[in-house]
């Protein structure tokens, strides 16, 4: 309890937690029902849904390298986060007046345009939000995992609300996402503890400040891929997270909702289930850093693998 109160006394922790909470809430309010929306409201087949997700992932993969390079040059500045928030505000108008008509007139053109927007505003933006939060945690004396956990909490609350909004009017989930993004932009612009010299002097870790002042060269970035340990981690992520994500996002929602008498009942139940799952994720993200310090990173990963195998 003492550690939690100490964390909340840190303005950098409070601001970073709120920003990442709003990002995941604004994304989760519609993303948690994206597959259901595509199949039940737009009538697309599983193959078409897979195509839409694949296009989005492909564009996001390219953008992640671009975004990563840009953020390295910006350092702690939140310029890109503000840009993402502006793009996210457009999610309601985009889905209502652009995406649906384009998919109806030409599926592949609509899928490509949608992939670009989703990657720019959400899919490739997510790692940037997480990376900035992680950098801030090292520089301003707070635990990254405990700040990132608030993102899962925001997603959990959003998923719970989405189930009820979706059954009322599917478009509500997108427009609510726009509203949350607008609040996020206000927070990004107005809450800037890093501009307060007294707060910076109190919480800044000087050694991390010196590290941040050095921007890695292109050669240093490429040099990372020569490390065997990096490739081990890449293979691990591909063989675990990728398969889980495809099942979780594209297959499970439709599978689960079939067990209910009406589509509406299934959609509401899925929203509740998804919310509970992400809320447990929120709790674990606060506890895992403590566990990792006790047993080590390697053993923590092996424990995670054992749980996934079950």
Residue ranges and their predicted role:
Residues 114-151:
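Cytoplasmic helix-loop-helix junction between adjacent transmembrane helices
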Residues 60-61, 141-163:
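Glycine-rich segments within core transmembrane alpha-helices of 12-TM secondary carriers
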Residues 2-61, 229-237, 241-261, 266-273:
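Helix-loop boundary and gating motifs at the non-cytosolic
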Residues 1-11, 192-234, 258-262:
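Juxtamembrane intracellular "pre-TM" segments in multi-pass secondary transporters
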Residues 158, 173-190:
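Symmetry-related core transmembrane helices of the 12-TM Major Facilitator Superfamily/SLC fold
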Residues 62-76, 165-166, 283-297:
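Helix-to-loop junctions at the C-terminal end of transmembrane segments
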